[in-house]
From Swiss-Prot:
It is found in: Cytoplasm. Belongs to the DsrF/TusC family. PANTHER family: PROTEIN TUSC. This is Protein TusC.
């Protein structure tokens, strides 16, 4: 049986709720079972990748750095939505905590269509 391609889509900002942390936990767990993973950041999910966050100031757990170790788990396909960046004034940011490929919404949808399962957080 062929392994399914699984996409993880992060649509919510960090620290306001547990969605980002739960998605990252699910991604790490799935990485042990599959090599066909893609990680997408759109809408407020692009905020997950901003460097130099200080969640401890709002008494939140700092899980963001864990995104940076995903390549060690052979997770290597990372995509971020160009429009989402522009809408949040982040189009000039280049020091993301992951090496992401910036895609237009059309190309992001095309890339996402290559996956059998899409999990949204």
């Amino acid at each position: 049986m062929a392994m399914k391609c699984v996409a993880f889509v992060f649509t919510q900002g960090p620290h306001g709720n547990a969605a980002g942390r739960e998605g990252l936990d699910a991604l790490l767990a799935t990485s042990a079972l599959s090599e066909n993973l893609g990680v997408f950041f759109l809408s407020d999910g692009v905020l997950q990748l901003l460097p130099q966050q200080q969640p401890e100031k709002i008494l939140a757990r700092n899980y963001i750095a864990t995104f940076g170790v995903l390549p060690l788990y052979d997770v290597e396909n990372f995509y971020i939505c160009e429009d989402s960046l522009q809408q949040r004034g982040l189009s000039e940011v280049t020091d993301w905590i992951l090496d992401v490929e910036v895609l237009s919404p059309v190309n992001l949808r095309r890339q996402l269509a290559n996956y059998d399962v899409v999990l949204t957080f």
